[in-house]
Structure formats: structure tokens, C-alpha cells
């Protein structure tokens, strides 16, 4: 990103998108996502290079830092049991969404939600629960419908 700014014109309206930290999350092994992502974020966001980059972007313009989703430490979610666990495992396997139509279950509160999106119908697991699955359950997820996954920062800086 730094080289883009150095070679860019004096335009004030820029949009930068970066794959960090998602790319890191996908590179980490099972059970390591939360700890390694936290350490990496602390290192990156406290570095002099990062803050010099932010200062350069914020000088003479409005800088907004945001994200397209949040993260949930699903490894700390309580285990579902009984019929709920069986339904979630059968429906979602090790994930939290499934393309297509299907039963959303008779559970109160609901454990699944049906949506029709531009990409077709989907079932989504809702709530803070996890279930046993072959290969283990991910300790950190993103892109789902839990509160932590839909919260996104919105930070505005001007210099």
C-alpha cells in the first residue's frame, strides 16, 4: 500500500482494501487463530510504519478505517447438546452456513435462519453455540451472523 501512495496522484478520494488480517487467519493451523491473530494485530497496529502510513493518509483528507466484518472466538462458545447439536452437525457439518433450502428446526430460540440472497437461498447457524464435528470446530470465525461477526469498526481520522 505504501508504494501505491508514493506513486499516486494528488487525488483525495482513494479506496484501499487489504486482505489483512483475513489472509493470516486462513494460514493459521487449527486452534491457533485467536492467539496468533491477536499477537499479529498488536504488532502491526503498534508499529511505527503503520502509524506513519496512517498519518500520511490522513494528512489533508478524511481517513476512514473500517472492515467488512468482525470475528467471533467460536472456540469459546458453549457446546450445543442433544437434539440441537445433532441438528447443527447434520445441517452445517463444521461450518456455520449452507447453500440451499432446508428445515430451520423447531427449536426456540431458533438455531438456524433461512435467507434468500442474491447468491441464492442459504441456511445460517445463529447464536453463540458450537457442536462436535470431525476435524474439530474452528476457534475463530468470520462472516457469520453472531454479534461479534457482524460488528465492524468505523474509525475516522483527519490531520
Predicted regions mapped to residue ranges:
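Feature captures the catalytic ectodomains and active-site-proximal regions of enzymes
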Residues: 1-159
Amino acid at each position: 500500500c505504501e508504494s501505491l501512495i508514493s506513486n499516486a496522484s494528488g487525488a483525495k478520494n482513494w479506496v484501499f482494501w487489504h486482505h489483512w488480517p483475513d489472509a493470516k487467519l486462513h494460514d493459521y493451523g487449527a486452534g491457533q487463530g485467536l492467539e496468533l491473530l491477536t499477537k499479529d494485530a498488536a504488532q502491526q497496529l503498534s508499529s511505527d510504519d503503520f502509524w506513519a502510513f496512517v498519518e500520511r493518509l490522513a494528512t489533508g483528507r478524511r481517513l476512514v478505517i473500517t472492515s467488512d466484518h468482525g470475528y467471533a472466538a467460536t472456540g469459546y462458545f458453549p457446546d450445543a447438546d442433544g437434539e440441537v447439536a445433532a441438528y447443527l452437525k447434520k445441517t452445517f457439518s463444521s461450518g456455520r452456513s449452507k447453500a440451499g433450502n432446508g428445515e430451520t428446526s423447531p427449536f426456540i430460540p431458533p438455531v438456524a435462519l433461512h435467507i434468500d440472497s442474491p447468491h441464492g437461498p442459504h441456511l445460517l447457524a445463529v447464536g453463540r453455540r458450537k457442536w462436535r464435528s470431525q476435524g474439530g470446530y474452528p476457534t475463530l470465525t468470520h462472516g457469520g451472523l453472531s454479534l461479534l461477526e457482524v460488528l465492524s469498526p468505523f474509525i475516522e481520522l483527519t490531520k
